[in-house]
């Protein structure tokens, strides 16, 4: 692992797609020791460009023994990152309440498109949906022409992963003073709307 400002910080990442892995890649690039929990039977981590700089363990989170392994990793971690739909981690027995029982200093980072609560919380969505609702899509492109979708740079990575990484770093700093963990609830639509605030 590389040294950097997050050297000595342990992160447990629950494998997902898009902004969660990108956030963990950034944390790893800053020196954090990231262990990614992959689903048993899924594709190899080596094929994922954003998986650089971290180790992986494959677990079946519907198996009580594997959940116990995950909780043991969480107990020794500084940070947890997950990007599932609201309620999934709680149903697995790995939500913030359960995790804080084994590690009260844990920074629990959550990434969703719409947030943990609200009318769209459980709706499916993708980067294009998040940047459209936040107004960013309308602002991209030339006047009088259709918008030019910016891949998933504005929503998933800009409004999502970067805001979650910034929240995690701030929470780690605060935990040094308070000795307490906290939940970072990063919604891609919120981060993208914040980016639009400078326009």
Feature map (PLM): residue ranges:
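Generic structural signal for helix capping and beta-alpha/helix-loop junctions
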Residues: 21, 44-45, 91, 116-118
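Active-site-adjacent "lid/gating" segments in soluble enzymes
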Residues: 26, 30, 92-199
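Glycine-rich phosphate-binding loop and adjoining beta1-alpha1-beta2 segment
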Residues: 29-61
């Amino acid at each position: 692992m590389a040294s950097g400002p997050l050297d000595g910080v342990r992160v447990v990442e629950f494998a997902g797609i898009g902004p969660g892995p990108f956030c963990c890649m950034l944390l790893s690039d800053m020196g954090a020791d990231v262990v990614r929990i992959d689903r048993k039977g899924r594709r190899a981590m080596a094929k994922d460009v954003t998986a650089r700089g971290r180790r992986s363990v494959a677990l079946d989170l519907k198996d009580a023994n594997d959940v116990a392994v995950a909780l043991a990793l969480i107990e020794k971690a500084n940070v947890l990152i997950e990007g599932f739909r609201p309620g999934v981690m709680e149903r697995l027995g790995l939500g913030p309440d359960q995790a804080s029982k084994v590690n009260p200093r844990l920074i629990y980072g959550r990434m969703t498109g719409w947030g943990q609560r609200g009318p769209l919380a459980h709706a499916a969505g993708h980067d294009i949906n998040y940047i459209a609702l936040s107004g960013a899509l309308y602002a991209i492109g030339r006047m009088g022409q259709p918008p030019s979708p910016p891949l998933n740079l504005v929503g998933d990575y800009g409004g999502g992963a970067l805001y979650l990484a910034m929240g995690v770093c701030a929470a780690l700093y605060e935990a040094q003073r308070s000795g307490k963990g906290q939940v970072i609830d990063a919604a891609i639509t919120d981060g993208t709307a914040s980016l639009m605030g400078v326009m």
